[in-house]
Amino acid sequence: DFAYPSSLPGEDEHLVLKNFCMQLKPGSRCLLLGANGSGKSTLLKVLAGKHLTKGDRVKVMGTDAFRDLKLNLTRAFLDTQWGMRTVAFAGYGCPLQADIRVGGMMEKLQSQYPERRDELVKLLGVNPEWRMHRVSDGQRRRVQLLLGLVRPFDILLLDEVTTCLDVIVRQDLMRWLQKETETRGATVVYATHIFDGLDDWPTHLHYLNRHGATGWQGPMGELALYAQLRKEGHPSPMLKIATTWLRAEIAEFGVAVEGADGEGARESKN
């Protein structure tokens, strides 16, 4: 279980994740599904060591996800908040929208992996001469991916970071991530609401329901609905799986206008 601490005396803690358990072998590509507010972002932050959990119940590669700082050398976490905060490598109090040359950002890290950097620059279509105050949202996202992926990772946590990418860059990125899992044994957990091109990508699926609990998890080969849709030649099995599960929740519990992440309230259909 994971709960955010209460802000007022006597107020109950806000329980976000309930009886959650995820186990993935090296080389897995896990697609994380769920409605807005189901706890996907919270889960990824817990795995990324961004939230302190009670005891040592959350382990990544056999060690405590929060307390073992060495994990940050082999664990990467990318979300949509990048570029919205001040960061050390750009200088104290200097936002990413300032006049910064892409080639000079995290220059030491880039220089440690020149071949990987050059591969990502070509893959993502990044120009090292770009200035951060002149790039579009999609270009800024490409820069984030370049800097976040240049160091080889053992586990990669992605929270909807492909939303701004054009279709070609997104497709090439997903193929590259698949290669990383197959050749280096890296593990990827990817939360998204965009399912085009993902029908054959994941090895595993994990569905978070409205309670922040596991609705279904396991290898794709064990999901009967997926096998049925592939047999029927459905044009987009992953999209159909997501809409089937989400609409079933709406039918049972009502329309979601607040979820586990505290984004509002839940409104009944009746």
Regions found by a protein language model. Name each.
Residues 212-250:
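Conserved beta-strand-loop-alpha-helix hinge in the C-terminal portion
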Residues 33-35:
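The feature captures the beta-strand-to-loop junction immediately N-terminal to the Walker
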Residues 29, 44-108:
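ABC ATPase nucleotide-binding domain signature region
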Residues 145:
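Hydrophobic anchor residue at the start of the ABC signature
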Residues 191-193:
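H-loop/switch region of ABC-family ATPase nucleotide-binding domains
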